[in-house]
Regions:
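Bacterial N-terminal signal peptides that target proteins for export
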Residues: 1-9
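General helical structural elements
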Residues: 9-10, 337
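Residue-level signal for mature regions of secreted extracellular proteins and peptides
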Residues: 12-13, 353
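C-terminal motif of bacterial Sec signal peptides marking the signal peptidase cleavage site
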Residues: 16-18
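Feature marking well-ordered beta-strand scaffolds used for ligand recognition
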Residues: 21-410
């Protein structure tokens, strides 16, 4: 039976960048300005009729089932929620994670066999069997003493066929932020392989693909490591750094390295910048495009900005070359990311806020394809998005989840 709880007033809660703990106290909702001329309004299939007792966090979707976490401290335990998303999202169940006051990240393995949930305060990685996708069964709770400050994000991915977890550990209790790499070949018995203190002041997120690991190091920029596919002898237990770049304004929150199956291009990675914000009201931060054609010397070449709103997480429909970005109070944004992004006319360049160097502006290049959820008539605050099978699923911190139709290429 679905578990439903009353939504406490949260529009005045300070997000302060939900992930960064910085603060903003702007009293009124920021007007989101859309200056582009051609993006379509993304159509909405439906909204999950559910208002949690706290704010909705990350979302992961597999088949017709979605999983969402709850963000915001609780004095006892938190739950993640399970949804039927075959049509309009419907809440079907929830799972309590004992002793976890906040749940941040959630991810499903590529084969659909397991689910991982990152817990903060106290930190751990909870791994569940998805033999029955809507009845997860706890397999293990990885919680060594040095991660108790909190696991903020947990990326899972394969390196040479073997599953690993990449955990971004919060600073706290006098300890600095850490990256922890875990062997998840046996999800019932995770094995720690590698730990390093890194990030300024956070290592916020990672992205793993083809034996390369991209790290979001907040004000230390983006680092690229060989962990089995970079040709420098790196492994998950002994990574080798290939290159690093600092993006405009820092605050590197998340990364997606694009591999376009149609063009064969793997030249660009997309970086989210998360500034300060207030839940349901305001946010700040751009999408930055870095050219990684030379992994030893990555460089920022383009950006996308929304006046009055900031980005959070991405999902990319790589087959069609479309990036979907969660944009907090700016809804969902769909961007054309196929082809050359770092070359443009002078008229297509702009100065990113905080920079004195003009870069290609994706909006001026006509790359904005769609905008979603600004037509709903209610405050929105989109934390995460996932593209899957022609639909875009969005976790909204103040409204539960939405299911939208994807956009088409022009």
């Amino acid at each position: 039976m679905p578990h439903t709880r009353r939504l406490y007033p949260i529009l005045g809660l300070v997000l302060g960048a939900a992930c960064s703990n910085s603060e903003s106290t702007r009293p009124d909702a920021t007007q989101v300005v859309d200056t582009s001329s051609s993006p379509v309004t993304m159509s909405v299939v439906g909204r999950g009729d559910f208002k949690p007792s706290r704010t909705t966090g990350e979302i992961a979707v597999r088949g017709t089932t979605a999983y969402t976490t709850t963000w915001g401290n609780n004095t006892t335990s938190s739950a993640f929620y399970i949804w039927d998303v075959s049509g309009t999202p419907v809440l079907v169940d929830s799972v309590i994670v004992d002793g976890a006051r906040t749940l941040g990240d959630v991810a499903v393995s590529d084969d659909g066999s397991s689910l991982v949930v990152a817990t903060e305060s106290s930190g751990s990685l909870a791994t569940y069997s998805l033999a029955s996708p809507r009845k997860p069964v706890l397999l293990s709770r990885f919680a060594p003493s040095h991660i108790t400050a909190g696991v903020h994000t947990a990326e899972i991915g394969r390196v040479n066929g073997k599953m690993y977890g990449f955990l971004s550990i919060d600073p706290g209790g006098g300890a600095k932020a850490q990256l922890v790499i875990v062997d998840l070949a046996n999800p019932a018995a995770p094995q720690e392989l590698y730990t390093i203190t890194i990030g300024s002041p956070y290592v916020h997120d990672t992205f793993v693909r083809d034996g390369l690991l991209f790290l979001g190091l907040w004000n230390d920029g983006v680092a690229i490591w060989d962990i089995g596919g970079g040709g420098k002898g790196g492994t998950p237990s002994a990574p080798v750094e290939l290159g690093r770049v600092k993006t405009v304004n820092g605050k590197v929150h998340n990364i997606w390295w694009l591999k376009d199956p149609v063009t064969g291009s793997n030249r660009y990675a997309f970086v989210g910048e998360e500034g300060s914000g207030s839940i349901g009201l305001s946010s700040v931060g751009d999408v930055h495009v870095i050219d990684v054609g030379d992994m030893s010397a990555p460089r920022e070449v383009a950006f996308y900005t929304v006046a009055g709103a900031g980005t959070h997480n991405f999902s990319v429909d790589e087959q069609n070359g479309i990036l979907y970005a969660a944009y907090y109070n700016g809804g969902v944004r769909a961007l054309d990311v196929r082809g050359t992004l770092g070359t443009c006319t002078e008229a297509q360049k702009s100065l990113p806020a905080g920079s004195g160097v003009a870069l290609c502006d994706l909006r001026k290049m006509g790359r904005e394809l769609g905008v979603g959820l600004l037509d709903r008539g209610v405050p929105i605050y989109v934390w995460g998005v996932q593209y899957l099978g022609g639909a875009v699923y969005a976790s909204d911190m103040v409204n539960g989840i939405w299911k939208l139709r994807s956009v088409s290429r022009p």
